[in-house]
């Protein structure tokens, strides 16, 4: 997976899967400061209800 792609998909679909969130938390120690700012922004969008958390794999597009 790639953080940029996850962020783009979440913004376009308005949904992020638990699998993607797990990947972010497992790999955050490798992220740059810019990457971390994107993760913080993603968290704010989730907190504000703009991006929903979805357990279904159908939100994950290959």
Predicted regions and their residues:
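Short, charged early-sequence alpha-helical segments and their helix-coil boundaries
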Residues: 36-62
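N-terminal acidic leader/helix
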Residues: 1-33, 56, 60-62
